[in-house]
Amino acid sequence: MKIISHLGPKNTYTGQATRMLAERIEEETELVDLASLEAVARSVALHEADMGVMAYYNYLEGLVQECLDLIYENDLKITGMQRLPIVLSLGAHSENHSTAEVYSHPKALAQCSGWLWDHYRDSKQIPTTSTAAAAQRVAEAKSGLAIASSEALKKYGLDLVGEDIGNKRYGRTNFTDFYLVARENGCAFDKTREYLTMVAITPHVDRPGLLAEILQQTAYHNLNNVKIHSRPALDDVAIEGLEPQMFYLEVVGHRNNDDMRRCIDSLRYKMKPEGRDIEVVRVLGSYERP
């Protein structure tokens, strides 16, 4: 049996994504909900769980900041991805809630900022660990408002005050991408399928045009960059007078593809300072493109 950890409590969007990812696994699975993304990452690293599911990217709010850093720090591998449509609703325990406090995950509050401004601009917004935790809190306290999925609100016995209240951008549906992570690579290369690979680059050199050099390597090897994220460096980088940065590149292709391998080798050569045997490029995993 494979144990899969994820952010709880039950009835979160992460829980829904976890169930969908678990259906792809041939072995029997047990799903365990934990209190934080840190707990999920550590549970896998410490062999308390075989795999974990973590929210990675929302198409309105962008990167879930701690996700990639936790994968990097705990030396985990991304083995799968699930894209989930996010449709947020507002629930309450009573009808008298015009100035009630609004509870939800910080990302959900941000994704509903326009609707909240129009209808509850004077209400205090209080962050919770998840959307389901917000629904649970309002149900137990019998006061306040919760932003969560309609399913979660109904399961906690709350009335729907507003449905599909998320911000709209160009009329597009909001999605969140979730990663399935493990201790080892688990996505075999199949030439008939399309993959994405996440690459972490920590330059131990600095010069004008450094980021352009990185992107030139992927272009030279005919690889398409889907996303690039800049974060404070997690490794000890001794570049005097600068705040060291690292880059996460999500690239179309599999880690075992010949073009990808040549690109990784080139990046390691160009980003590594002369005379120092240190890691500058790490492949965080390959996974099927949704």
Question: Which positions does each model-derived feature cover?
Answer:
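Domain-level signature for soluble enzymes in the chorismate/prephenate branch of the shikimate pathway
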Residues: 1-290
